[in-house]
UniProtKB/Swiss-Prot annotation:
This is A.superbus venom factor 1. First processed by the removal of 4 Arg residues by furin-type protease, forming two chains, alpha and gamma/beta precursor, linked by a disulfide bond. This mature AVF is composed of three chains: alpha, gamma and beta. Interestingly, a peptide (from position 1111 to position 1125) coming from the pre-pro-protein has been identified by MS/MS, suggesting a longer gamma-chain in AVF-1 than in CVF. Residues 657-739, 992-1270 form a propeptide. Keywords: Cleavage on pair of basic residues, Complement system impairing toxin, Disulfide bond, Inflammatory response, Magnesium, Metal-binding, Secreted, Signal, Thioester bond, Toxin. InterPro entries: A-macroglobulin_rcpt-bd (IPR009048), A-macroglobulin_rcpt-bd_sf (IPR036595), A2M/Complement_sys (IPR050473), A2M_N_BRD (IPR011625), Alpha-macroglob_thiol-ester_cl (IPR047565), Alpha-macroglobulin_TED (IPR011626), Anaphylatoxin/fibulin (IPR000020), Anaphylatoxin_comp_syst (IPR018081). The keyword Membrane does not apply. Residues 743-754 are annotated as: Factor B binding site. Residues 661-739 are annotated as: C3a-like domain. It comes from Austrelaps superbus.
């Protein structure tokens, strides 16, 4: 019998011939094949001269069930028996949903030997890029974008692209399909409620979303600057051993090219890790003259801050520079960072050097030398030691050194050092590596060295390529030619042969460099020796990055290249490739001052494209196969030379390495400190001489010192010394103030047309170059347009995509726009309603003569300003030639929203004039608060009858600022069911299961089963790469061997037994059916007759009328039965055989008519028994059989039999438990109970069971079958199909969203201004999350902040006259914060969070002194000087005393004018317990004169008039009062008495008793109790209301503020208030007429009402 088995095996394996020794057949493909892309492969027959037709076919892996592509090619001697067929793999035929790597089989037949190679697959079929019009945006603005798409041949591809916009938190807020050819791509509009930070626009192909391209842009609030500042350090590093000072040149230019006059404030510092340590003594004021200045960091200054400079090595120096214009109207802050502090100024890398060398042949060592900041270091001499070779780096930092290697060595130690003449030897940079010898095949000693020595290679060059060979003479004489492949962008671009003559050891060929080879290519060459050896080498070649085609933007004529006037007409000319599509945009260069990181460039395009190279080294390889692998190729030959299987498409990415005290006081300090020789004591002395912001005495300061008595003594001595000098200076100090202004009358300016169109980007056009090309093959097109109104330089950026020449980014074309006289109106991003602010109109005169200018601020009722409806505000100022003058205007915004600020100016005696109108954003008062509500939508759990309905209750906003909007944003996101466990069992652990079957009919199945189930599992999970894709072929061979051997034990009736003469076994026959049915899914050669014959035998011979199956001949190897051999045997056997019948159903249904009836009888039997079963194992097995037959959907009985709902256990039976639990998992998957399946999978994986053979057969089969089914079903389980309806109160039609698996992560958003209840309903399957964000402005409430565990006092006062004032500051105050912890011990790690007054910044120097020195009061501090909103200071304290009050003082400087300042706040809290906190507010008292200092002309009175004024005018008569009281919208007229004045929440509350209702209004019963009249505190003086006085008062209906059961009255500018004399005063002659008028007014309106 065994002889018969071997014969059958031999017959089945006859299709596997042995190797032919007559020729060497080779197949080479790219290491990764891309779908839907034409790819070139190579098939070669070396040593064969017989013409052949080869069949190239591509099949799916691992099952090879589909032929994805097939072609035939003729191989003949005329073509060198070499063919390069083109293949294309259609993505639609493959499973793109798989999370695993996918492979295809490339097969070559028609040769004497078939060639096969399994190759990794990629679905990325091209490149896609996004261009946004800018790199930075403000909330609410549109983001314009366009898409460029091309294939790997750089051909334009108008394939649909999905564009997603993602917030900084990664939430997808928009996802839309876009056709790159469309010129009407709708911009994405940023919402007003938007996340600040870096956003992403992500583009990916619709049918291959795993690869994407991302464009970034920032979103924040900003105002464009009027000039840019560039910093240029003298060196890119700070050499620690040097003695030179460090210089930084400062260049400041207006955006229209003129030079800035002003001042720069420069502060140097060192960044140590992530902490910035400034050098306070380096703070200097540098004049900017003619746009230039220079800052110097002296070595002594650096040493004064850091005594041991060697400790700074490895850290970086930075220079922070603030440049302010002469007029003070604009300020730009910039920083030069990343200046490395080094002992050696260079670093050496071997990033472009091959790791392998050929002994006895030249070795090209490419070294890359960088500056410490990672930039290339040019002109640096380098030298290699041992094998000496010298060179000098080029502009890209590289130098090539040729090393002549010795013959007999296997490793080559290499050390390269810089050889700079100005550096001592110990400071030269060095780098070492060891190159390894190339291993020849079989130790033959045959080598090939490909050399390309040109330094810089560009398109159009003819490149000499040298082929050097070395080996024994016999081998070399066999070489007739070299075969070479050129790869670029991951594709085989060209294949060729270079002949070699006999005796030639060096062959040179010329290679023409075409644009297709940009940005780099790989040159791979090999030759064959005999018919079994391949000798190979490769080299990576960089090509200069340029456009493959042409694109130029220029002025259409010489006139267009000149400086232009705003609004002028001009033309530009485009020159490019015929048929190219050109995208244009003009961007204000001020945008790039704020952010130029994200601008599209040709370099970025090539950087992305270069990543498509599948090669991962600089060339060469460990051996012949390594050469192909490292170049990104896959190779197989007829002699079983095979490259390793690739498992990732990309290469590992290397780290990217690119890119005022007086002089006398200072002298006194220096002299005093010099008296201490000890460095530590000198530090104590210096700290003692630093000014203490809190004003502590020297003695109190000394209490904080912990460095010992000697330090304390030095500190006290120096502290007292400097105090004496300061006191003397104080007595001599004086303060001088000066002011002048004038008025003049000039002509009107109504004819001046104001400039108002100031876009940040425009000219967003797409143009096709359809014009006939010229003699150079270039098409051109002229565009006409009108310039916008900005005085700036526009940068016109053009990006083209040509039909066959890829993407080209043109050099930007600049258009400078200016005129000799103009206004620059500097408007902040936003101002707060009712906060008085100063804006500046800067007048620029670039003429050669002085001028006099009249400036006019136009009236706008939305502001209170010096311009009124009846009289415009004008001022005349002189402006010197080639200079500027700032005219300040103070305004009070009275209404929210966007409002025009317009300024006009005309030059006296000339026609020159200008006008500017800009929008000013006015935001509401109060503190912006967010309320977030999250609702989970899960209708299957939370719904009734499948629908979840929920009412969202409106938020209670009792603290909302009146007359402000509420913004509510509703966002819905689906919750896709994620896969619980990926790669449940590691495929690499299954090697032991692929074994050779053997033995009797039972043993053969025991040993065949592991190969079947391992292959089944690895196919399902896509894990062959973990085990080795070549092992699948071996596994299939073992399966077929087991199949052939089992035929020996098949009886004529298709039943099976251990031996042919033994009675047939029901269980064994069913098991053979089950395993063969599984194997039929793996290989095609298992015949259906074999499977179905066993099924028919079971039905006809072993099934009883009631459906049960009987066993008449149990198996010999009882261990192979698994758990079925226990109790409840009939149910177990019937369920087991039923599963086998169901497995075979797809194969046998057409061949066995009674199969369905047999299955139904077994089902009926099992259904009767199911609920009564006792064993967990039998319950699980039966549940699986019934669920597989689709007759069980209820999992309650199954789960009741489990232990912990994740396993089905019986005592002391591990493998049976694994088997039974696997059946249960299969049952749950068949019932679609995916949530319940998760814990079961986790339990199975935790068992770390990798299967076996004897005694473990059923556990092995079932665990891998179950986990494979889990892997198959979970990715396709997309049980998310929700319909959501949101009924918002202001919408007639509900918002309806449909959420499924494909769009789950795209947020659906809606916004409403109402704060009302609304309903949401959800139905369907799955979950979603609805987030409701409500944003509103809350009143500042001091009493709402109850202090817990902290006492806190906050106050502000005027700074002392001798206090140092920050440069550019308009005023200086001192902030005093005193706190004490109210616990039993000191509070550790306490934080003080200070919200600054608007317009004020904290004094960093004061805070630095508090945090430095031996008498350290604070641990550290952080300043956020955000001028758009209020700045903040966060102070960290190591402790706060519980026994005494501790105070901090520091100065705050006013940098811009703000009137009616909102209160600032100070919060102290414990880091470890946030409930322990206290908040207090602070505000400068008007008595300090702060308000008066911002007055300009009569603006102060106007600012006060924004409140209601107490009407004391004598010219008011009865008729005027009646007219005003009866005006439209006047709601009420009362006579009141003022009972009480309260201060609350920053407002004044006037409590009034309504004595008489003269005209009734909204308030139904105003006399029921006293009424509250609310006024802003700023209006107190203007109103001047007195207690117990009577008043005539009326107001508008819009000024009523409904409360819970009451009404408050707002006092606004529309409120009429007059004092009503009392009865005694009415007797005086002075008040008689007034009292009569009031009485008559009351009678008229009460009796007759208002006249109609």
């Amino acid at each position: 019998m065994e002889g018969m088995a071997l014969y059958l095996v031999a017959a089945l394996l006859i299709g596997f011939p042995g190797s032919s020794h007559g020729a060497l057949y080779t197949l080479i493909t790219p290491g990764v094949l891309r779908t839907d892309t034409e790819e070139q492969i190579l098939v070669e027959a070396h040593g064969d001269s017989v013409p052949k037709q080869a069949v190239i076919s591509i099949h799916d892996f691992p099952r090879r069930q589909k032929t994805l592509f097939q072609t035939r090619v003729d191989m003949n001697p005329a073509g060198g028996m070499l063919v390069t067929p083109t293949i294309k793999i259609p993505a639609k035929e493959l499973n793109k949903e798989s999370r695993q790597n996918q492979y295809v089989v490339v097969k070559v037949s028609g040769l004497p030997l078939e060639l096969e190679k399994v190759v990794l697959l990629s679905y990325q079929s091209g490149f896609v890029f996004i261009q946004t019009d800018k790199g930075i945006y403000t909330p609410g603005s549109p983001v314009r974008y366009r898409v460029f798409s091309m294939d790997y041949n750089m051909h334009r591809m108008d394939k649909t692209v999905i564009v997603e916009f993602q917030t900084p938190e990664g939430v997808v807020v928009s996802s839309n399909p876009v056709n790159p050819s469309s010129v009407l791509i709708r911009p994405y509009n940023l919402p007003e409620l938007v996340s600040f930070g870096t956003w992403k626009a992500v583009a990916k192909y619709e049918h291959s979303p795993e690869e994407s391209y991302t464009a970034y842009f920032d979103v924040r609030e900003y105002v464009l600057p009027s000039f840019e500042v560039r910093l240029q350090p003298s060196d890119k590093f700070l050499y620690i051993d040097g003695n030179k000072n460090f210089h930084v040149s400062i260049t400041a230019r207006y955006l229209y090219g003129k030079k800035v006059e002003g001042v720069a404030f420069v502060l140097f510092g060192v960044k140590i890790d992530d902490a910035k340590k400034s050098i306070p003594d380096s703070l200097t004021r540098i004049p900017i003259i003619d746009g230039d200045g220079e800052a110097i960091l002296k070595r002594d200054t650096l040493r004064s801050r850091f005594q041991n400079l060697n400790e700074l090595v490895g850290h970086t120096l930075y220079a922070s520079v603030t440049v302010m214009t002469e007029s003070g109207s604009d300020m730009v802050v910039t920083e030069q960072s990343g200046i490395h502090i080094v002992t050696s100024p260079y670093q050496i890398y071997f990033t472009k050097t091959p790791k392998y060398f050929k002994p006895g042949m030249p070795y090209e060592l490419t070294v890359y030398v960088t500056n410490p900041d990672g930039s290339p270091a040019a002109n640096v001499p380098v030298v290699s030691e041992a094998i000496r070779s010298e060179g000098t780096t080029l502009s890209d930092g590289t130098a090539k050194l040729i090393l002549n290697t010795p013959l007999n060595t296997q490793s080559l130690p290499i050390t390269v050092r810089t050889n700079h003449r100005d550096l001592p030897s110990e400071r030269q940079a060095t780098k070492s590596m060891t190159a390894t010898a190339y291993q020849t095949q079989g130790g033959s000693g045959n080598y090939l060295h490909v050399a390309i020595t040109s330094a810089e290679i560009k398109a159009g060059d003819n490149l000499p390529v040298n082929f050097n060979v070395r080996g024994n003479a016999n081998s070399l004489n066999q070489i007739k030619y070299f075969t070479y492949l050129i790869l670029t962008k991951g594709k085989i671009f060209k294949v060729g042969r270079q002949p070699k003559g006999e005796g030639q050891n060096l062959v040179t060929m010329n290679l023409r460099i075409t644009p297709d080879l940009i940005p780099a290519f790989r040159f791979v060459a090999y030759y064959q020796v005999g018919n079994n050896e391949i000798v190979a080498d490769s080299v990576w070649v960089d090509v200069k990055d340029t456009c493959m085609g042409t694109l130029v933007v220029k002025g259409a004529s010489s006139r267009d290249n000149r400086i232009q006037k705003p609004g002028a007409a001009m033309k530009i000319k485009l020159e490019g490739d015929p048929g190219a599509r050109v995208g244009l945009v003009a961007v204000d260069k001020a945008v790039y001052v704020l952010n130029d990181k994200y601008k599209i460039s040709q370099a970025k395009i090539w950087d992305t494209i270069e990543k498509s190279d599948f090669g991962c080294t600089a060339g060469g390889g460990q051996n012949n196969l390594g050469v192909f692998e490292d170049a990104g190729l896959a190779l197989t030959t007829s002699t079983n030379l095979n490259t390793k299987q690739r498992s990732v498409a990309t290469c590992p990415q290397p780290t990217n390495r690119r890119r005022r005290s007086s002089v006398l006081l200072l002298d006194s300090k220096a002299n005093k400190a010099a008296q201490f020789q000890d460095q530590n004591l000198r530090k104590c002395c210096e700290d003692g001489m630093h000014e203490n912001p809190m004003g502590y005495t020297c003695e109190k300061r000394a209490k904080y010192i912990q460095e010992g008595d000697a330090c304390k003594a030095a500190f006290l001595e120096c502290c007292r010394y400097i105090k004496g000098i300061r006191d003397e200076n104080q007595r001599e100090s004086e303060l001088f103030l000066a002011r002048s202004d004038f008025e003049d009358e000039l002509f009107g300016e109504d004819n001046i047309i104001s400039r108002s169109d100031f876009p940040e980007s425009w000219l967003w056009l797409t143009e096709d170059l359809k014009e006939p090309p010229n003699s150079q093959g270039i098409s051109s097109k002229t565009l006409s347009f009108y310039l916008r109104d900005s005085i700036t330089t526009w940068e016109v950026l053009a990006v083209s995509i040509a039909p066959t020449k890829g993407i080209c980014v043109a050099e930007p074309y600049e258009i400078t726009v200016m005129k000799d006289f103009f206004i620059d109106l500097r408007v902040p991003y936003s101002v707060v309603k009712n906060e008085q602010v100063e804006i500046r109109a800067v007048l620029y005169n670039y003429a050669d003569e002085d001028i006099y200018v009249r400036v006019e601020l136009l009236y706008n009722p939305a502001f209170c300003s010096a311009s009124t409806e009846g009289q415009r505000y004008r001022v005349q100022v002189p402006v010197k030639a080639l200079s500027s003058w700032a005219v300040p205007f103070v305004i009070v915004p009275l209404e929210q929203g966007l409002h025009d600020v317009e300024v006009k100016a005309s030059v006296r005696g000339e026609l020159a004039s200008d006008g500017v109108r800009k929008k000013l954003k006015v935001v509401p008062e109060g503190e912006r608060k967010n309320i977030v509500t999250v609702i989970e939508l899960d209708p299957s759990v939370k719904g009734v009858d499948g629908t979840q309905e929920q009412t969202v209750i409106a938020n209670k906003l009792d603290d909302k600022v009146p007359e402000t909007e509420i913004e509510t944003k509703i966002s819905v996101l689906g919750d896709p069911v994620a896969q619980i466990i990926e790669n449940s069992i590691d495929g690499s652990k299954l090697n032991h299961l692929i074994i050779t079957p053997s033995g009797c009919g039972e043993q053969n199945m025991i040993t065949m089963t592991p190969s079947v189930i391992a292959t089944y599992y690895l196919d399902a999970t896509g894990q062959w790469e973990n085990l080795g894709v070549d092992r699948r072929t071996e596994a299939v061979k073992q399966i077929m061997k087991g199949y052939a051997q089992q035929m020996v034990y098949k009886k004529a009736d298709h039943s099976y037994a251990a031996f042919p003469n033994r009675a047939s076994s029901s269980w064994l026959t069913a098991y053979v059916v089950k395993v063969f049915a599984m194997a039929a899914k793996i290989v095609k050669d298992i015949k259906h007759e074999i499977i179905c014959g066993g099924v028919k035998w079971l039905i006809l011979n072993r099934q009883q009328p009631d459906g049960v199956f009987k066993e008449n001949a149990p198996v010999i190897h009882g261990e192979m039965l698994g758990g079925t051999k226990g109790a409840e045997p009939e149910v177990s056997l019937t369920a087991f055989i039923l599963t086998a019948l169901l497995e075979s159903r797809s194969v046998c249904n057409e061949h066995i008519n009674i199969l369905d009836s047999s299955i139904n009888k077994a089902i009926d039997y099992l259904l009767k028994k199911y609920e009564k079963l006792q064993r967990p194992y039998t319950t699980a097995l039966t549940a699986y059989a019934l669920a597989a037959a689709e007759r069980l959907n209820d999992d309650r009985v199954l789960m009741a039999a489990s232990t912990g709902r994740d396993r089905w256990e019986e005592h002391n039976a591990r493998t049976h438990n694994i088997e039974g639990t696997s059946y249960a998992l299969l049952a749950l998957l068949k019932m679609k109970k995916f949530a319940e399946a998760g814990p079961v999978v986790k339990w199975l994986i935790d068992q770390k069971y990798y299967g076996g053979t004897y005694g473990q057969t059923q556990a092995t089969v079932m665990v891998f079958q179950a986990l494979a089914e889990y892997e198959i079903q979970i990715p396709t389980h997309k049980d998310l199909n929700l319909d959501i309806s949101i009924n918002l109160p202001e919408r007639e039609v509900p918002l309806r969203y449909s959420i499924n698996y494909g769009n789950a992560l795209v947020a659906r958003t809606a916004e409403t201004k109402l704060n009302e209840d609304f309903t949401v309903s959800a139905s369907g399957d799955g979950k979603a999350t609805m987030t409701i964000l409500t944003v509103y402005n809350a009143q500042l409430r001091e009493d709402a902040n109850v202090c817990n565990k902290f006492h806190l006092d906050v106050s502000v006062e005027n700074a002392q006259l001798n206090s140092k004032q920050a440069k550019g500051a308009k005023d200086t105050l001192r902030l005093k914060i005193c706190t004490r912890y109210l616990g039993e011990v000191d509070s550790t790690m306490t934080i003080i969070d200070v919200s600054m007054l608007t317009g004020f910044l904290a004094d960093a120097e004061d805070l630095t002194r508090l945090s430095k020195g031996v008498d350290r009061y604070i641990s550290k501090f952080e300043i956020d000087n955000n001028m758009v909103q209020k700045g903040t200071v966060v102070i960290y304290l190591d402790k706060v005393s519980h026994s005494e009050v501790e105070c901090l003082h520091f100065k705050i400087h006013k940098h811009f004018e703000v009137g009616f300042i909102q209160p600032g706040s100070v919060k102290v809290y414990s880091y470890y317990n946030l409930d322990e906190q206290c908040t207090k507010f602070y505000h400068p008292d008007k008595g300090t004169g702060l308000l008066n200092k911002i007055c300009h002309g009569n603006i102060c009175r106007c600012a006060e008039e924004s409140c209601s004024l107490l009407n004391q005018q004598k010219k008011i008569d009865l008729q005027l009062r009646i007219q005003k009281a009866c005006a439209p919208n006047v709601d009420y007229v009362y006579k009141t008495k003022l009972l009480q004045i309260e201060e609350k929440d920053g407002n004044d509350i006037y409590v009034m008793d309504v004595l008489e209702v003269i005209k009734g209004g909204t308030d139904r019963n105003p006399q029921a109790k006293a009424r509250q009249y609310v006024s802003q505190r700023k209006c107190q003086e203007a109103l001047n209301l007195k207690l117990n006085n009577d008043y005539l008062i009326w107001g508008l209906s819009s000024d009523l503020w409904p409360r819970k059961n009451d009404i408050s009255y707002l006092i606004t500018k529309n409120t009429w208030i007059e004092r009503w004399p009392n009865e005694d005063e009415c007797q005086d002659e002075e008040f008689q007429n007034l009292c009569d008028d009031f009485a008559q007014l009351s009678n008229t309106l009460t009796i007759f009402g208002c006249p109609t």
